[in-house]
């Protein structure tokens, strides 16, 4: 165990890519330990990619890129603005709503921040919003991407923990709504304090017209969740249906998707999904060695000497994951901690669906935690703000998200009620 963990920490300290660190420490352990044949290392590496649910990752990524390239974002933002723009802080509310809807299409925080931010950041700045407030709100609202179904982190966690992906998708609905609502309340008071302008109230006829134009984007979450909950298709099959739907809408409804931009979409989707799949492949022998060395059991024994309270353990998990999420991206952090945390949660009676949503929400907040949050870098690139300025502006909405994290952590029914109601688990 010392050789295994020592090799992993050493590789991380010398800035080795996380995939190389995961595979490298497993290889060192197999070679030096001498108790595990190399064939086991190879079998677990390739075996990790044979899981049928993993096929949903590249398909959902492709669907999101097809819809984004197909030109849905302007119509989606226009609908959100018509619906909420007349409320105090309306542009901020429209940004949150647009992020929530796009989250159900992309399943990723950075993609949500880029797609919505490129439209809404200039609009808020033009309307007189403080640039820091606008950028910080967009960054935090982008965290809805991996929480509202569908969600790439939920798929990774579900496969790693052997938990129903459909249950995770359904369980993420209420936490996503709570986070969106909390950010809207925050934006309302910020707008009242700074007297931000409102858009003129639109008639219902105008709003319905914009809703009609955005209908393909609005219907996609219904298609995904409706098909899964009705038993029409599995989450993986839903991803395939979504790809076909996105391609048809982009080509024939929005008419911006053609053979010229398809290679760019395929290349981008291939690179994004390839990185995730390689990470998962390298994590499989890592998880196997973690289980073989009984590392989760050692941690459970140590924690049980301190406390056996699920609430205290959830607090420790939150603190650990918030710190881990600062230097590490969501996907690699998930494949490392899931094999360790799931047995710990099971030992104290924490529902695995609830634990999965808490883990994912924690790690997603790492994407907006200074100084190395990936979403912060993306928003800085779009807005032209310095990272230092955005790092200062991010704290108020970040603390709102922390409050939501506490609520989701200690009110488990927010994550488990819907799965039990509609899936019977």
Task: Place the predicted regions along the sequence by residue.
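Alpha-helical transmembrane segments of multi-pass membrane transport proteins
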Residues: 1-425
């Amino acid at each position: 165990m010392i050789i295994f963990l020592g090799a992993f920490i050493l590789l991380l300290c010398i800035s080795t890519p996380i995939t190389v660190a995961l595979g490298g420490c497993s290889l060192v352990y197999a070679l030096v330990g001498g108790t595990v044949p190399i064939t086991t290392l190879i079998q677990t590496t390739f075996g990790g990619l044979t899981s049928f649910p993993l096929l949903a990752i590249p398909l959902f990524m492709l669907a999101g890129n097809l819809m984004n390239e197909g030109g849905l974002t302007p119509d989606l933002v226009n609908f959100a603005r018509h619906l909420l723009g007349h409320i105090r802080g309306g542009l901020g509310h429209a940004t949150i709503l647009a992020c929530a809807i796009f989250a159900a299409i992309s399943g990723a925080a950075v993609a949500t921040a880029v797609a919505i931010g490129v439209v809404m950041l200039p609009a808020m700045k033009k309307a007189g919003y403080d640039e820091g407030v606008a950028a910080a709100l967009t960054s935090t609202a982008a965290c809805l991407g991996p929480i509202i179904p569908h969600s790439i982190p939920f798929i990774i966690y579900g496969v790693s923990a052997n938990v129903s992906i459909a249950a995770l998708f359904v369980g993420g609905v209420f936490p996503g709504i709570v986070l969106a609502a909390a950010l809207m309340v925050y934006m309302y008071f910020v707008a009242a304090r700074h007297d931000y302008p409102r858009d003129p109230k639109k008639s219902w006829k105008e709003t319905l017209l914009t809703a009609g134009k955005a209908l393909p984007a609005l219907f996609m979450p219904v298609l995904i969740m409706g098909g899964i909950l009705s038993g029409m298709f599995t989450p993986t099959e839903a991803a395939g249906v979504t790809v076909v739907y996105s391609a048809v809408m982009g080509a024939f409804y929005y008419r911006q998707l053609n053979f010229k931009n398809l290679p760019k979409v395929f290349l981008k989707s291939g690179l994004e999904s390839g990185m995730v799949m390689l990470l998962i492949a390298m994590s499989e022998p890592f998880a196997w060695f973690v289980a073989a060395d009984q590392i989760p059991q050692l941690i459970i024994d140590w924690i049980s000497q301190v406390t056996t309270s699920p609430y205290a353990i959830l607090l420790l998990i939150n603190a650990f994951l918030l710190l881990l999420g600062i230097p590490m991206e969501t996907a690699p952090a998930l494949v490392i901690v899931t094999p360790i945390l799931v047995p710990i949660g099971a030992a104290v009676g924490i529902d695995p669906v609830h634990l999965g949503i808490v883990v994912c929400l924690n790690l997603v907040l790492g994407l907006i935690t200074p100084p190395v949050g990936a979403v912060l870098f993306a928003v800085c690139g779009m807005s032209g703000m310095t990272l230092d300025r955005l790092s200062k502006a991010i704290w108020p909405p970040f603390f709102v998200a922390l409050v939501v994290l506490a609520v989701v952590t200690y009110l488990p029914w927010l994550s488990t009620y819907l799965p039990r109601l509609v899936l019977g688990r």
